């Protein structure tokens, strides 16, 4: 089946069908092979991506800039000081103006509504580079990595341990759409958004996967194929950091926890990691850790997103 994503926004993976997500993953795999063998793939010659950063990021900025360079295009970095938003210009007007100059907009924002408003008023594709609700580009890289390492996604037990945050949301959504058995373990009061839980349950019913929410990390990771965690306090939650350290301490991914998983389990983390908090050195630096492959796959997954949304590749190859 030929799937066209040209002109689409990528705000949340719940907006995408399993077939569309697989199209992105297959395209990402193709680009990764092409890069490895030195095959040029300058499919976006003359195209420009505007990158709006309300929140700084190493991986997001570098991977999107390199992705556009490999595809023959150009990435333009815009932080809060570069935009007129702080002086009163609305997001709607910013979106309208940027649409006259560039071919796509990637935004890394605090509030999800900001990226939704950009998409509402922009006439070019808008990509969510991270919001407080979702992180779709990270989840695409995550499931690309699982597919590479496990040979499949369907039936793989993916366990997320920690805060029910934006990364958790996207991991839940994509995994249940692709038939994984997704388990989330959080402290009480730190569960994922109820709307996302409902989506995950609906997705799993349609895909043949499953979803389970627990508050016991040991029970959650039993026979896990993948153990995933993230920081306990996200950017903007610094005031809560000390309290969160106490609450999340029993949810640390360490050698005592991972011994309950399968012996060939994979450890994953979106990075940056706070070593000694959500994960210990002996786990993140172990042979079971795939965090560096996972980080690399951000590049390939985002190349696929850019090429597909900007019409640089035809699917069905």
UniProtKB/Swiss-Prot annotation:
Carbamoyl phosphate binds at residues 57-60, 84, 108, 135-138, 270-271, 298. It is an enzyme of class 2 (transferase). Pathway: Amino-acid biosynthesis; L-arginine biosynthesis; L-arginine from L-ornithine and carbamoyl phosphate: step 1/3. The keyword Magnesium does not apply. L-ornithine binds at residues 166, 230, 234-235. Disulfide bonds: none annotated. It catalyses: carbamoyl phosphate + L-ornithine = L-citrulline + phosphate + H(+). It is found in: Cytoplasm. Homododecamer. Belongs to the aspartate/ornithine carbamoyltransferase superfamily. OTCase family. This is Ornithine carbamoyltransferase. The gene is argF.
């Amino acid at each position: 089946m030929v799937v066209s994503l040209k002109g689409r926004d990528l705000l949340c993976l719940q907006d995408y069908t399993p077939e569309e997500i697989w199209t992105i993953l297959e395209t990402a795999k193709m680009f990764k092979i092409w890069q490895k063998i030195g095959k040029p793939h300058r499919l976006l010659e003359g195209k420009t991506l505007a990158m709006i950063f309300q929140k700084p990021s190493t991986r997001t900025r570098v991977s999107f800039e390199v992705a556009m360079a490999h595809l023959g295009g150009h990435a333009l970095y815009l932080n809060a000081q570069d935009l007129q938003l702080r002086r009163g210009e609305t997001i709607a007007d910013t979106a309208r103006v940027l649409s006259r100059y560039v071919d796509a907009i990637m935004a890394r924002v605090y509030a999800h509504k900001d990226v939704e408003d950009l998409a509402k008023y922009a006439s070019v594709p808008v990509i969510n580079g991270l919001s407080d609700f979702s992180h779709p580009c990270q989840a695409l890289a995550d499931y690309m990595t699982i597919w590479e390492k496990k040979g499949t996604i369907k039936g793989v037990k993916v366990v997320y341990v920690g805060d029910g945050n934006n990364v958790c949301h996207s991991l839940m959504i994509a995994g249940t759409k692709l038939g994984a058995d997704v388990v989330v373990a959080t402290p009480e009061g730190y569960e994922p958004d109820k709307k996302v839980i409902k989506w995950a349950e609906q997705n799993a019913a349609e895909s043949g996967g499953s979803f389970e929410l627990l508050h016991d990390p040991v029970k959650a990771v039993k026979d896990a194929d993948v153990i995933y965690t993230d920081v306990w306090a996200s950017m903007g939650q610094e005031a809560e950091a000390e309290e969160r350290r106490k609450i999340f301490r029993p949810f640390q991914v360490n050698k005592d926890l991972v011994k309950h998983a399968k012996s060939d389990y994979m450890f994953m983390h979106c990075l940056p990691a706070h070593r000694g908090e959500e994960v210990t050195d002996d786990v993140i630096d172990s042979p079971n850790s795939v965090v560096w492959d996972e980080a690399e796959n951000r590049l390939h997954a985002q190349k696929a997103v850019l090429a597909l949304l900007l019409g640089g590749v035809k699917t069905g190859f």
